[in-house]
Amino acid sequence: EGQSVLVPSRALNDLTKVLAGVDQLTLRLGERDASFEAGDVRLTTMLIEGEFPNYKGLIPTSHPNRLTVSREALLEGLRRVKLLAREATPVRLAMTSDGLDLVAVTQDVGQAHESLDAKYEGTELTVAFNPDYLLQGIEVLAGDEVLIETVDALKPALVRSPEHADFLYLLMPVRVS
């Protein structure tokens, strides 16, 4: 009781696949491992040593720039723009009062551009993100809309659902020239 442990995300992802339809989960904590039993399935994983990083210090206290966009439209647009982008190519989000432009520029290939309807409050801003990390956050977000809150192009952005206040995804931008 009162014990705090760090469980690898891969183990938790595997566990969620087994939990469908299970009424009871048993957790057993060892000094260096944790076992989860659900029905006739047991998953054992090594625990991560150390303390969870103090992420609260990274969360900006004010967010002068707020973008609200359809979750499905953003997912589809990011996937289309990402098709042209190479593995390390960031996707730029250009946020204006006219909406949202997604842009990926890849040397030798060209650029992909997608315009989306969005509501934006704040100063015009372009922020670049690793498209895989941005997609991962949006894919697990519940609700029909995505709210992206930013301070500037270099500070962490918050990705949230306006309908589900308990979800928060902290995303670091990528520096682009």
Regions found by a protein language model. Name each.
Residues 58-62:
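Bateman (tandem CBS) regulatory domains
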Residues 51:
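Glycine-rich, pocket-lining loop/helix-strand segments that form or immediately flank
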